[in-house]
């Protein structure tokens, strides 16, 4: 496993991952709204491509914050907690989202193939299948961008739109740190449930 600065990331496309029939999407440990939203976006895309896909996280603690448990419940996000990750190696492709496989904030799960989708600076290189865009305010924006590249109809899925909106909202300190035009484009284009966003905000 190579460390910081060993290689420059290229812009991987979701199309490159469609050769896998079984796909596991892993959020970082103790996932926040952005990680959950990003994972949900990828889950919806691969599910609609007919893939056998699951969305999970590991680590010491289950998600317990009221805003996040409400987000998962109200938006129908199939997020599962993996209590014993070493006992269940991943068959097929493992995608880490909003984190990088081998970094300190994500439990390592043995996997045949690995891909990384993240909006943080490069920490660990473990695969050629990487998409890092640290100039974006949220990983939700990166996933939205990748879905746009595939002409995936995000606007038709209000639950997904709500998740992506809330992920950006939380990762940019309630939009106060919003500066990238792509983040702004996503915020303006999403079809989301204002009442649910208010519910999540008020329960945080």
Predicted regions and their residues:
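Short coil-to-helix leader/linker segments, especially the first N-terminal amphipathic alpha-helix
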Residues: 1-7, 73-78
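Short secondary-structure boundary/hinge segments and terminal tails
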Residues: 64, 89-91, 165, 185
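Active-site cofactor/cluster-binding pocket
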Residues: 73-129
